[in-house]
């Protein structure tokens, strides 16, 4: 996995730098996301890993993507195909998103809850996390049916367990001492 990220990083960085320079971060993120989705398709993955000429592979890939790619996106795909790197497009997309979040000083925060959070609850958590971290946050809410109530908040290597399950586990540990 780390080898793939090593291969993907220069492509993601080049795409990010170009998109930033052109003021088209959203467009490039959409193009890379779509391209990554196409590259993950089982039949497409077999095709791009075949022994066909890179020009043929890139043109077919571009046709599949249709008008989702502008001329610069198409050139990007051609370069990746020429270097036999189309298979790492999903990792290129992930790295691009990370570079963008880093540039925009946005921290990705995942909230695990027993139920879907309301917009007001998400806003309250976002505000508290922004104050704690000193930067903007992008929240992702995931439902975890094993939680009784409360939430578990994760970012980077940090876990904040505010769930009832976590409280019960801590109480059980304290009682067993």
From Swiss-Prot:
Indicate whether Ligase appears among the record's keywords.
no
Any Pfam family the entry gives: OSCP
* Record's keyword terms, sorted: ATP synthesis, Cell inner membrane, Cell membrane, CF(1), Hydrogen ion transport, Ion transport, Membrane, Transport
Alphabetical GO CC annotations of the entry are:
plasma membrane; proton-transporting ATP synthase complex
Membrane topology value: Peripheral membrane protein
Its annotated compartments are: Cell inner membrane
Its main subcellular localisation, reduced to a broad class, is: membrane
Tell me one GO molecular function of this protein: proton-transporting ATP synthase activity, rotational mechanism
Task: Keyword check for rRNA-binding, yes or no.
Answer: no
What is the protein's known function? F(1)F(0) ATP synthase produces ATP from ADP in the presence of a proton or sodium gradient. F-type ATPases consist of two structural domains, F(1) containing the extramembraneous catalytic core and F(0) containing the membrane proton channel, linked together by a central stalk and a peripheral stalk. During catalysis, ATP synthesis in the catalytic domain of F(1) is coupled via a rotary mechanism of the central stalk subunits to proton translocation. This protein is part of the stalk that links CF(0) to CF(1). It either transmits conformational changes from CF(0) to CF(1) or is implicated in proton conduction.
Quaternary arrangement and interactors, per the entry?
A: F-type ATPases have 2 components, F(1) - the catalytic core - and F(0) - the membrane proton channel. F(1) has five subunits: alpha(3), beta(3), gamma(1), delta(1), epsilon(1). F(0) has three main subunits: a(1), b(2) and c(10-14). The alpha and beta chains form an alternating ring which encloses part of the gamma chain. F(1) is attached to F(0) by a central stalk formed by the gamma and epsilon chains, while a peripheral stalk is formed by the delta and b chains.
Q: Which family does it belong to?
A: Belongs to the ATPase delta chain family.
Q: Which NCBIfam families match?
A: ATP_synt_delta, PRK05758.2-2, PRK05758.2-5
Task: Name it.
Answer: ATP synthase subunit delta
User: Which source organism?
Assistant: Actinobacillus pleuropneumoniae serotype 5b (strain L20)
Organism classification: Bacteria, Pseudomonadati, Pseudomonadota, Gammaproteobacteria, Pasteurellales
């Amino acid at each position: 996995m780390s080898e793939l990220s090593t291969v993907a990083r220069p492509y993601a960085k080049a795409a990010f730098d170009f998109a930033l320079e052109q003021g088209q971060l959203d467009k490039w993120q959409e193009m890379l996301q779509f391209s990554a989705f196409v590259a993950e398709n089982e039949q497409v993955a077999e095709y791009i890993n075949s022994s066909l000429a890179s020009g043929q592979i890139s043109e077919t890939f571009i046709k599949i993507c249709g008008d989702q790619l502008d001329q610069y996106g198409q050139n990007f795909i051609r370069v990746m195909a020429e270097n036999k790197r189309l298979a790492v497009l999903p990792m290129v997309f992930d790295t691009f998103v990370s570079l963008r979040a880093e540039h925009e000083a946005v921290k990705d925060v995942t909230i695990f809850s027993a139920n879907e959070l309301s917009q007001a609850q998400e806003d309250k958590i976002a505000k508290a996390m922004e104050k704690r971290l000193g930067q903007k946050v992008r929240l992702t809410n995931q439902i975890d049916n094993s939680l009784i109530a409360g939430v578990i908040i994760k970012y980077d290597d940090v876990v904040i367990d505010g769930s009832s399950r976590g409280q019960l586990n801590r109480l059980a540990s304290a009682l067993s001492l």
